[in-house]
Every structure is written in C-alpha cells, then in structure tokens.
C-alpha cells in the first residue's frame, strides 16, 4: 500500500513539472483549498485580547493565524476552507462541543477565503441553535457557504453551490459522514453522505451548467495517513457519477493526493489550524488546483500543487497561533520563540517525506 502511495505522489510531482507551462495560459483558473480550521479552547484564549470579554466576539484577534499564507490566497482566483465548528453561540467552547467567535470567520473572509464549508461532524455540536447561528452569521457576512440549509426548498436551490469564477461555473458539493451521533434536526439541515442524494446533487450540478464539479466530503478515519477502503469506494463513486475533483477532510492528518487525468482526489488536507500536537497533526496541506478551459467550454484539471504547512501553536514561533509553509521556514530556527517547535516540525516533516518518498 505504501509503495502504491509513493507512486501516486511521484505521479503528482511529475505531472506538475510536465504541465508547468499550462499555468501561463490566459484561461487558467486557480482554486486553493485549505484543511480543517478548528477552534479549540486554547486557540480562542490565545486570540482573546488582554482584559477582553470572553463572550464579546470583537475582543478576539485572529490576525496572526493566516498572515504567512496570505500570499497564497492572494495569488488564487478562489479559496475554500473547511470551517469545522458552529459559529457564534456563547459561551464559546472548544472540544468536544465547539462554538467559535464569529471574529475567526470574519478574519478568514478578510484574508481572502471565498467559500466556507459547513457540513462536518461538529456542525451539530450546539444543536439547532448552532446551525441557525452559523447560517445567520455567514449570511450577514456575505460570504458564500455550503453544507447547511434552512429549508428543503433552499437545499434544492443552493445545493450544489454554484460559483462563477473568471467566467466559468464551478459546482461545490460538501457532505459529511455524520455528526458525532448528534441529531440532525431535519434531513435537509446538513448534507450527509448518502448515495442517492449525492447522485441527485451531482446531476443538478451538470443540469445547471457546471464547467467543473468539486466534491468536498468530510470522511475517513482520524489520524490514519492512508485512506480507508470506504474513502476509496466513495472517491470512485463520485468520479463515476460526474465529479472532477474530490478534496476531503476530517482525518486531521494529510493523506495522499491522486491525479490521474481527468480526475484528482485529495483524500485529506489534514488540519489547517488547530491545537492538536500529536504526530502529523500539525502538518497540513494547502492544495492548489490549476484549471484550464477546454475547446468545449468546460474546465479540466491541468495541475495539482500541494504546499505543506505547519500549525505553530501559541508562544512557539510567535506569540499566537500561526500557519506557515514548511519549506519557506526550513533553516530559520533562530526566528522561533521556542526552538523545540522548529525541531519538532523538521523531525516530523523529514519522517513524513521519508514515508511517502517526497
């Protein structure tokens, strides 16, 4: 299995190198995806301004979190993030029943995230109140989001989410395997992985003129570096039914990317930002899909570009949590407040590269 994964990762590297010239075409479109944006309790406490009110979202400052990847967002035409928490229910809380200050969502929007994913196993952590609060806050922000809905009619109308990007129509479909055993108030409140429903939504995407269909499943087994048999089954099912790209989340570690044109599958982007520190949970992937127009007017995937990231926790690299591209920071140990975090990053990154022959 590891040998197969190595071949897959090498195939991605080779295709990126061979197709580099494609990215210069005027009809090129770039979509960036980041993994799980978590809101553990220590993250919120680190963002709380000195003397701030814990129940006042304006007293939280998340500006440090995205600053070292902002240039990647700026270079993209569209940025997608998995926002793995209900938003705005006080008192704010971390694991196991999350509720994040809306200032985290506002900061994500400010730095260039264009689409929030909400169908994940924590969306029901605060019950119907949390779903409604998340819906209202994101709607007032004016940021597109997908995965939760307020009525059956709205689910039909807004699922998939259709985004117009540089004149192309891209369909985004976000599903979750479940909600940690918590009840979903109504079947249409949260998109769940169900074969018949998934097929229906993919069909809607094509009927509504999608030039590219992207599925964003919340799936898999936590902390497993290789995709499960169920993930592979679903990936095959999605592609056979009309999905061009699959970009997954939930395992909290990075899993392989497979690019066999015309399809691309990223099984898990891992954590983008969290308080987790177990082996491999601080390594994430910022994934860029480079797309080009076809003679038929649709989009095809020309390149898959992974950027591996490291989530540095409070008082490690900086005073607050921040996410950095690993390769940009190799050799800069002196800049860390706590050198042990640099050493941990290098150690885990070297082991990760060795395991997957990067």
Each model region followed by its residue ranges:
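Bacterial N-terminal signal peptides that target proteins for export
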Residues: 1-9
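Hydrophobic h-region of N-terminal signal peptides that target proteins for export
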Residues: 13-22
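Acidic, metal/ion-coordinating pockets
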Residues: 24-358
């Amino acid at each position: 299995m590891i040998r197969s994964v190595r071949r897959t990762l090498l195939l991605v590297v080779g295709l990126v190198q061979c197709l580099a010239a494609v990215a210069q075409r005027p009809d090129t479109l770039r979509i960036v995806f980041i993994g799980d944006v978590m809101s553990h309790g220590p993250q919120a406490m680190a963002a709380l301004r000195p003397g701030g009110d814990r129940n006042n979202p304006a007293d939280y400052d998340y500006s440090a979190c995205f600053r070292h990847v902002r240039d990647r967002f700026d270079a993209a035409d569209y940025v997608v993030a998995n926002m793995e928490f209900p938003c705005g229910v006080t008192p704010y809380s971390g694991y196991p029943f999350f509720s994040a200050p809306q200032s985290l969502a506002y900061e994500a929007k400010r730095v260039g995230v264009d689409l929030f994913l909400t169908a994940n196993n924590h969306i029901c952590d605060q019950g119907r109140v949390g779903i409604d609060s998340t819906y209202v806050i994101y709607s007032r922000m004016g940021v597109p989001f997908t995965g939760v809905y307020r009525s059956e009619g709205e689910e039909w109308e807004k699922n998939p989410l259709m985004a117009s990007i540089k004149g192309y129509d891209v369909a985004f479909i976000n599903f979750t395997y479940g909600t940690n055993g918590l009840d979903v108030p109504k079947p249409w409140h949260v998109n769940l992985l169900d074969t018949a429903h998934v097929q229906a939504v993919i069909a809607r995407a094509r009927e509504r003129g999608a030039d590219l269909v992207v599925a964003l499943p919340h799936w898999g087994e936590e902390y497993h570096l290789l995709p499960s048999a169920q993930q592979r089954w679903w990936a095959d099912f999605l592609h056979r039914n009309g999905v061009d790209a699959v970009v997954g989340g939930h395992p909290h570690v990075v899993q392989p990317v497979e690019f066999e044109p015309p399809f691309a599958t990223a099984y898990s982007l891992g954590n983008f930002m969290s308080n987790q520190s177990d082996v491999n949970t601080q390594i994430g992937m910022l994934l860029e899909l480079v797309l080009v127009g076809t003679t038929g007017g649709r989009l095809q995937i020309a390149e898959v570009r992974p950027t591996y990231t490291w989530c540095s926790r409070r008082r490690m690299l900086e005073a607050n949590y921040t996410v950095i591209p690993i390769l940009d920071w190799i050799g800069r140990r002196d800049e860390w407040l706590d050198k042990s975090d640099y050493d941990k990053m290098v150690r885990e990154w070297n082991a990760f590269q060795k395991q997957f022959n990067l």
